[in-house]
């Protein structure tokens, strides 16, 4: 059994590498941008080159796990629709077709941004309605996967966090931590709600579903629901950071890229199938604190 982990240098990809090592699962990892260890670079903005590179790296994968993302997220997609489509749709289609030729399973991470945020909490089969290009592209790839594969796992997730001090694309709490450590103020959207998801929970749940052959579409997020401002305050209290530096933004700026402000994903479906615990907000923050303390010893 060999897992091909695409984007193994990112937060989610690194966690897959860690857990594969712990379970003695053979894996091959690729990177898209920053160098890390012996990971091989694959250009996912060049789908033709990508397919050839994957063939050379891992000709017989058991499963392909796609953790690749672009720095800048939603804003980057709106400003760079061409590269965004290549990464989030065209490369995914190539990978799906390649997986089918190899009889390999495929794991794809999607987003709460496939919804409009008007009627939470959302179940997997609720009507979608993305408000921005990022969500549209994620949904388009979801549809292609579901129409062209049998052995797939689509995990919709959101607000993924974990300790990754070296990343050039920090998650929300890492960005908050770095900003306050520099003595700067941090503007926090109190109008933006979601499910904070510790990366370890996300990856453990995905691996468990894959191991049990529970294919399909799932919501995999933390069991808590909170706005970004209160989440930031909770983190600061635990980390001993200056809470006065957190500036509460109660209204979205007029030029913000449209997005769902009330994004609550229902996890009843996945909870019935896995033993992995999806921790709530406070438990997830305690996990993060343990990681931080371990890294600075």
Provide a role label for each language-model segment.
Residues 1-23:
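N-terminal Rossmann NAD(P)H-binding glycine-rich loop of SDR-like oxidoreductase domains
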Residues 281-297:
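Amphipathic terminal alpha-helices
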Residues 143-194, 201:
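NAD(P)-dependent short-chain dehydrogenase/reductase
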Residues 187-193, 218-226, 273:
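Glycine-rich Rossmann NAD(P)(H)-binding loop
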Residues 93-131:
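Conserved Rossmann-fold NAD(P)-dependent oxidoreductase catalytic core, especially the SDR/UDP-sugar
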Residues 44-87:
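NAD(P)H-binding glycine-rich loop region in Rossmannoid oxidoreductase-like domains
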Residues 76-107, 139:
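NAD(P)-cofactor binding segment of oxidoreductase domains
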Residues 203-205, 212-255, 261, 296-297:
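Mid/C-terminal beta-alpha module of Rossmann-like enzyme folds, strongest
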